[in-house]
Amino acid sequence: MSQPLTSELARRWRLDVDTADSASSPTWVQVRAIGEMTPKVTPKMQDDTDYDSDGYGSSTKTLLNWSIEATLITKTSPVTGAVDAGQAKIKAAHDKFGEEGQVHIRWYDRNGLPDDAYEGWAQVSWEPSGGKADALDEVKVSLDGNGARTAIINPAA
């Protein structure tokens, strides 16, 4: 009988943002109070069906887009009243254009799995959720990759 496997939890992901905006000397700050996070790689497929396929379709992958969809819960310091520094850095880029509208991020398995660690530059979308009187203040964030994501050594390894 083989060794049983252990399930990993969705909350294993950690997201850091570079507050120095520097590929050569980044200053990483954890983005805290993540309620949900989904890293994605979406292929762009082009139809390359031809007469030789006997009526069957065919596609070729021509492009990859990466993104991170996250729900952030607004939490503040009980001492200073300041919002999380990682969230603040991302929010500061959401209504800017060009270089000012992107952030340098890395995301990885907080338990140290070696094959789940990446970094890249991303454009920011920031959408407050609103809600009823009993709702938490949450924000839906989309980080859409600008260029390739790069595999990195997991900082938690």
Model-based region annotation:
Residues 34-37, 93, 155-156:
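Compositionally biased, intrinsically disordered low-complexity segments
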Residues 26-28, 113-120, 151:
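Membrane-topology and secretion signals of cell-surface/extracellular proteins
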Residues 82-118:
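Short, acidic/charged, Gly/Pro-enriched secondary-structure junctions
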Residues 119-157:
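Mixed-charge, glycine-accented linear interaction segment located at domain edges/termini
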Residues 2-77, 121-137:
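Solvent-exposed edge beta-strands and adjacent loop segments
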Residues 75-81, 149-153:
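Short, cysteine-centered beta-strand-loop-beta hairpins and adjacent loop/turn segments enriched
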